[in-house]
């Protein structure tokens, strides 16, 4: 197991180096939240680009103070250059203008604010934006379109959340980050498990079977139930996948019109 993950680290570092170079960049930037996924991406980027990998810390008005502390501790441990921009003034303005906004709307606004800061920094510093969404999130559509899902390159987009945990262990990510419940930290009390209804330890095996069995054909409910998955779980996950599949697609553009 250790040997496999050491090989994976080498593979992902090589991927980052080659893909960034292909796009004509020497520097990268990414959002560092204090959570697991961005910590893993941050350490991978630091291994490859050293001082040319820059983290942006962008706490909102509802971010947990410990998220910022965990991000700062990671930067200190791995000598990661960072800049901190508070998005609190902007999300407060949104809240004052849209007092009836749901938590999802407020969360999406914060996610898109962060991506705006990342791409502004990208332009200012001639850096490429690196993504931090894992495969579980991507398959479920558990992310904000043109928010945290937006990036030029994503080294962990084909790793399920449970695999990111294992990779983090071999990258020596602090236990404080490894052990805390996953959360997008977009509103008070939020957690991935509350949003999704299940922990990743339950979701990921199902996602792996869905990918293996139904890559080129429609997902079949009964087949998955016969494998031992609870019907309510399967229905919930299939619904999320189908409802949010558009988030992984490029915009649909009308074909050029050729009048006869």
Swiss-Prot record:
It is an enzyme of class 6 (ligase). Its EC number is 6.3.1.5. Keywords: ATP-binding, Ligase, Magnesium, Metal-binding, NAD, Nucleotide-binding. The keyword ATP-binding applies. Transmembrane segments: none annotated. GO terms for molecular function: ATP binding; glutaminase activity; metal ion binding; NAD+ synthase (glutamine-hydrolyzing) activity; NAD+ synthase activity. The keyword Membrane does not apply. CDD domains: NAD_synthase. ATP binds at residues 31-38, 132, 161, 183. Homodimer. This is NH(3)-dependent NAD(+) synthetase. It comes from Helicobacter pylori (strain J99 / ATCC 700824).
């Amino acid at each position: 197991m250790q040997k496999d993950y050491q090989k994976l680290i080498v593979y992902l570092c090589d991927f980052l180096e080659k893909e960034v170079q292909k796009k004509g960049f020497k520097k990268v930037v990414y959002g560092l939240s204090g959570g697991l996924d961005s910590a893993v991406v941050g350490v991978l980027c630091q291994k490859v680009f050293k001082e040319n990998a820059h983290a942006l810390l962008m706490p909102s008005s509802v971010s947990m103070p410990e998220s910022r502390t965990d991000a700062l501790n990671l930067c200190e441990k791995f000598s990661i250059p960072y800049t901190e921009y508070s998005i609190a003034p902007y999300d407060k303005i949104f809240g004052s203008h849209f007092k009836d906004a749901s938590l999802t709307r407020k969360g999406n606004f914060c996610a898109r604010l962060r991506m705006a800061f990342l791409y502004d920094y990208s332009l200012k510093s001639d850096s490429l934006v690196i993504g931090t969404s894992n495969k579980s999130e991507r398959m479920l559509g558990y992310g904000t379109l043109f928010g945290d899902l937006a990036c030029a390159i994503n080294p962990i987009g084909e790793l399920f959340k449970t695999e990111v945990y294992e990779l983090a262990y071999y990258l020596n990510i602090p236990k404080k980050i490894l052990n805390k419940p996953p959360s997008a930290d977009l509103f008070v009390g939020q957690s991935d498990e509350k949003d999704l209804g299940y922990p990743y330890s339950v979701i990921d095996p199902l996602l792996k079977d869905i990918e293996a069995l139904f890559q080129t054909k429609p997902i079949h409910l009964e087949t998955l139930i016969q494998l031992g998955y609870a019907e309510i779980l399967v229905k919930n996950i299939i619904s999320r996948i189908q409802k949010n599949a558009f988030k992984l697609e490029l915009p649909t553009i009308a074909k050029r019109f050729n009048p006869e």
